[in-house]
Structure formats: C-alpha cells, structure tokens
Amino acid sequence: MTKVLILDQSKSVRNILRERLEYEGFSAEAVENEAAASALCERIPFDVILSDTECKVPDAGIPFIALSADTSIDTAVKAVRNGAQDFLTKPIDMNHLLQSMLLLQHIVQTEIPILFQKIPTYEPYNPL
C-alpha cells in the first residue's frame, strides 16, 4: 500500500485529500507544518508527499507533488525546480491527482530500482 504524507496549512484540504486517498486505497497521514512533517518522515517510510507550495518539504528523499492556489507559470516552474514531480492547482482535480500518484508509484516501484542496480565495471585486459 502506498503511504502518502499530506502537508498543507488548510485543515479542510488535508481532510478532503486524506479521506479521498484512503477511499482509493492509499495509506494517508496529514500534517499542517514542516516540523510535524519532518517528525513523521523519521518514523514512517512515506512513498510520496503532497505539499502546498507555501510549505517546505522535508529533505527526506521522498518524491513529492506540489499543490498551489497560485496558478502562475512562475510558481509551477519554481516547484519543479525545487524537485516536485508534478504541480497541481487548487481546487485539486482528484482524477488528475490520482493519475499523477499512480504514475509516480509506477516510477518509484519499477524505474528507480533499476538506477541503483550495480553496473558491471570495465576491467581492462592485462595478460601479464
């Protein structure tokens, strides 16, 4: 089961996202600030973080999707430059969010492990 951390200052956004994601079969936790998110990331191995762009995502090496009420291109570009795998505007289109989550889940489970496989090293031929 994919574990999701929701980081948003709005209680209603946190509750709606948590309830919908749990309904869709995800395991979800929701917090309102960076300190709570960091503490939770130390205890739970999350697969993805959904974070409002106003919040700083914990530096835990976890892929994240940025959420924002600001629809400007500059905000989207800044989020992606800061490491977001996707950028969604509020109000959140749940179908788009679920598609993004499933794609990210696929990448994490299938493509990233390939990057960490040991690549055979080249050993030069030395007959002596």
Predicted regions and their residues:
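C-terminal output helix
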Residues: 92-101
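AAA+ ATPase active-site-proximal loops
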Residues: 116-128
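The C-terminal output helix
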Residues: 102-115
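Two-component/phosphorelay signaling modules centered on CheY-like receiver
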Residues: 11-29
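Short hydrophobic/Thr-rich beta-strand motif most characteristic of the beta2 strand and flanking loop
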Residues: 25-34, 40
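Active-site beta3 strand of CheY-like receiver
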Residues: 44-55
